[in-house]
Amino acid sequence: MRVVLIGRGRLATNLLPALQEAGHEVVSINSRTLEGLPTEADVFVVAVKDSALKDVISQATKGREQQLFVHTAGSIPMSLFEGYTSRYGVFYPMQTFSKERLVDFAEVPVFVEGECPQIRQLAESMSHRVYALSSEHRKYLHLAAVFACNFANHCYALSAELLEKHGLPFDVMLPLIDETARKVHGLHPLDAQTGPAVRYDENVIRLQSALLSDTPALQEIYDLLSLSIHRKAQ
């Protein structure tokens, strides 16, 4: 396929080589200027941040109202395209992306929506895990991903800050992090949960909470998560 990739952020940086490796002809376009945007392609992929999506779509579709456009956002409905183009859909790769570390796209779950068969064909050319999903269900999928990825990584950052404050290296946590992730491949997360909160060891919880008294925001997070873990364990 001839694919126009609009955007040069983290996702687009990973999409470009994945599309090329799958054998597609790719034109990469800067979303801020749209300079050199072709008038025709098999599919236009809009891979920009959610807050810029509507503006980019409104500009990119001008004169291309019969072209196929897809966006890559997990929490934005497909209906955003209505009134801009007659052929549209969603191509949502559910993964955490960084410019510095390219992922193996063949293992990335891709969730598609839309009537045009080219959308699924594009996804299947790049990934072994392709699923049809409506906008209504996709917003809950994205929400669940925020808990599983973004919040988990934030806890890593909090752990790193705490260790640094006391002169300890973060890499001592890596075996623990790796084993925690491996366990949920074979166990339900509730069954994999360990630590003082799951058994509600009040003495340990109270002591650890007190250690955070000089950082009330972190103490609040600790107390809230401990209570949530305890309630889920009951």
Listing of model-derived features with the role each one plays in the protein:
Residues M1-L37:
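NAD(P)+-binding Rossmann beta1-loop-alpha1 motif at the extreme N-terminus of oxidoreductases
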Residues V3, V26-V27, Q67, Y88, ...:
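Hydrophobic anchor at the start of a short beta-strand
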Residues L15, A22-E25, L102-H185:
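Internal alpha-helical scaffold of NAD(P)-dependent oxidoreductase catalytic cores
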Residues L16-Q20, R32-L102:
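Rossmann-like NAD(P)(H) cofactor-binding subdomain of soluble oxidoreductases
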Residues S28, H71, G89-V90, F111-V112, ...:
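Structural signal for conserved beta-strand scaffold positions within catalytic alpha/beta enzyme cores
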Residues T180-Q234:
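Interdomain hinge/lid region at the active-site interface
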